[in-house]
């Protein structure tokens, strides 16, 4: 399995700013984001399940004011940060999880089907 660095682990703090990165998902370029919740890093495609559009109006701002839920800024859909499950608002299922690992102070995403590294 190929690992691609996303950011330094210290850049992600519980319930705060995310770190965006690019992936190919089924051959299509898509933004993804990594967040930390309860000390664990999670990552998802940056696509609301209500309408397939990016969720953040302000770059890297996904958490609500409490730092407990991921929100779509456009329509208010709310998702659990640890599972991506829809917990409220207009959504059709959960977020697509991107596999990540935290090793030696670095957060990596795991390049494996249906995800591919985006090469410019």
Predicted regions and their residues:
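Axial heme c-ligation environment in periplasmic c-type cytochrome domains
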Residues: 89-90
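N-terminal pre-ligand scaffold of iron-sulfur
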Residues: 1-66, 80-81, 94-120
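A conserved acidic, glycine/proline-rich C-terminal tail/linker
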Residues: 85-86
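Short cysteine clusters
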Residues: 48, 72-75
């Amino acid at each position: 399995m190929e690992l691609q660095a996303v950011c330094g682990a210290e850049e992600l703090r519980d319930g705060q700013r995310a770190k965006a990165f690019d992936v190919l998902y089924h051959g299509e370029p898509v933004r993804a984001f990594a967040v930390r919740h309860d000390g664990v890093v999670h990552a998802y495609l940056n696509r609301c399940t209500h309408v397939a559009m990016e969720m953040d109006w302000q770059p890297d701002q996904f958490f609500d004011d409490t730092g407990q839920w991921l929100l779509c800024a456009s329509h208010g859909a709310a998702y659990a940060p640890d599972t991506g499950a829809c917990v409220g608002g207009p959504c059709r299922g959960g977020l697509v999880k991107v596999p990540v690992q935290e090793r030696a102070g670095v957060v990596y995403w795991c390049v494996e089907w249906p995800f591919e590294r985006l090469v410019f």
